[in-house]
Curated annotation (Swiss-Prot):
Subcellular location: Cytoplasm; Secreted; Cell surface
Residues given in the record as (2R)-2-phosphoglycerate binding sites: Q163, K337, R366, S367, K388
Co-factor binding comment: Binds a second Mg(2+) ion via substrate during catalysis.
Protein task: Catalyzes the reversible conversion of 2-phosphoglycerate (2-PG) into phosphoenolpyruvate (PEP). It is essential for the degradation of carbohydrates via glycolysis.
Cellular component terms per the entry's GO annotation: cell surface; extracellular region; phosphopyruvate hydratase complex
Transmembrane segments: none
GO molecular function, a single term: magnesium ion binding
Presence of the UniProt keyword Cytoplasm in the record: yes
Protein name: Enolase
Organism listed in the record: Rhodopseudomonas palustris (strain BisA53)
Reported cofactor(s): Mg(2+)
InterPro entries in the record: Enolase, Enolase-like_C_sf, Enolase-like_N, Enolase_C, Enolase_CS, Enolase_N
Swiss-Prot/TrEMBL keywords: Cytoplasm, Glycolysis, Lyase, Magnesium, Metal-binding, Secreted
Length: 427
């Protein structure tokens, strides 16, 4: 019934107009699972490898025909006839077939596309939603959204060094109310930026990308928008940052090009602690560079008891790197990006390890996305309590929010919104 009879890979476009991989997995009973693979702009050096063609005469070298050929050829040859219910074994076969530590030969984009499509096909075969198939009967928690409403860094053409300024509607009673809160703040922010003479073009993740001089300026606009929209900062809505500090870490220091300032490792830790003291910031992602291990420890020691410190480039959804961070007291949370590691099995293992160690986990999109909403289901399946999937604009972002609305409606009275319980500092 659930034997794999066909695997079809194709090249499609992501939200930035770059090629990416889409995969259909067809089962013996006619069930079909489809998955499209995202792509990042600020990528960690330790991520699994995204296979690109390198032919400059086609899509500027970013084509994914090699990955598609691997899907339709070598990978299908190995997986054809296997049972789609055997997710772990299927993922293990692909990892072994690739034979490299970072999936560089066949490509994490090829392997992930199949891995996710297999799970979706199996869920379809059982006539179950994906969150229920992956998460079982306990999957019922709707995540607090981290809504990226001001973009900077690698996600926008403006002087702001930090990559994302986010709102978290922790005070809402339901996911649908949280989404409404975020949307109202988003539109209020647009009006406030316009009034102040700033452009309201949006960045890669749907947030605004105004020419603001500093993080303080961006945070002040967000605070004003929250209040003007009728909500209380620090009570109804909290703030979160993604510094993406690896991008401006040079020669052992943090170089703020937009502010024309350089901060030492200790100054960076103190600066972030100061921001968290002056604003209702409850989560800071990648506040230190991916290889600045001393900096991560210092930051965790200073603010880790009061603030969620999320490792993205630091951990790259990799259990080996996460285990090292847990052992050495670096960060207290992990960002979960399926394409950083390349299989569903390894993704779920990272969430499980984090939860067992008392770390939180945040399910996340990438800046180059598609209409695929798999991560919405995975957020509920893992009961991780937080999701980061962009702003309240662009269909590649709202597709995930809309899927969460559907899931909440389907769960009915069983649905539970994570709210303040998602963040240890607010419990």
């Amino acid at each position: 019934m659930t034997a794999i009879v066909d695997i079809i890979g194709r090249e499609i476009l992501d939200s930035r107009g770059n090629p990416t991989v889409e995969v259909d997995v067809v089962l013996e009973d006619g069930a079909v699972g489809r998955a499209a693979v995202p792509s990042g702009a600020s990528t960690g050096a330790h991520e699994a490898v995204e296979l690109r063609d390198g032919d400059k005469g086609r899509y500027g070298g970013k084509g994914v025909q090699k990955a598609v050929e691997a899907i339709n050829g070598e990978l299908f040859d190995a997986l054809g006839g296997m049972d789609a219910e055997s997710q772990v074994q299927i993922d293990e076969v692909m990892i072994a077939l690739d034979g490299t530590p970072n999936k560089a030969r066949l490509g994490a984009n090829a392997i992930l596309g199949i891995s996710l499509a297999v799970a979706k096909a199996a869920a379809e075969s059982y006539d179950m939603p994906l969150y229920r198939y992956v998460g079982g009967t306990s999957a019922r928690m709707l995540p607090v959204p981290m809504m990226n409403i001001i973009n900077g860094g690698m996600h926008a053409d403006n002087p702001i060094d930090f990559q994302e300024f986010m709102i978290m509607p922790v005070g809402a009673d339901s996911f649908s109310e949280a989404l409404r809160c975020g949307a109202e703040i988003f539109h209020t922010l647009k009006s406030e930026l316009k009034k102040a003479g700033h452009n309201t073009n949006v960045g890669d993740e749907g947030g605004f990308a105004p020419n603001l001089p500093s993080a303080d300026a961006a945070l002040d606009f967000v605070m004003a928008a929250i209040t003007k929209a009728g909500y209380k900062p620090g009570e109804d809505v909290m703030l979160a940052l993604d510094c993406a500090a690896t991008e401006f870490f040079k020669d052992g220091a943090y170089v703020y090009g937009g502010e024309n300032k350089t901060r030492s490792v200790s100054e960076q830790a103190k600066y972030l602690a100061d921001l968290a003291a002056r604003y209702p910031i409850v989560s800071i992602e990648d506040g230190m560079s991916e290889d600045d291990m001393d900096g991560w420890k210092e930051l965790t020691d200073i603010v880790g008891s009061k603030c969620q410190l999320v490792g993205d480039d630091l951990f790259v959804t990799n259990v080996t790197r996460l285990a090292d961070g847990i052992k050495n007291g670096r960060a207290n949370s992990i960002l979960i990006k399926v394409n950083q590691i390349g299989t569903l099995t390894e993704t779920l293992a990272a969430v499980e390890m984090a939860h067992k160690a008392g770390y939180t986990a945040v399910m996340s999109h990438r800046s180059g996305e598609t209409e695929d909403s798999t991560i919405a289901d995975l957020a509920v399946a893992t009961n991780c309590g937080q999701i980061k999937t962009g702003s309240l604009a662009r269909a590649d972002r709202t597709s995930k929010y809309n899927q969460l609305l559907r899931i909440e409606q389907e769960l009915g009275s069983q649905a539970l919104y994570a709210g303040k319980a998602a963040l240890k500092a607010l419990r």
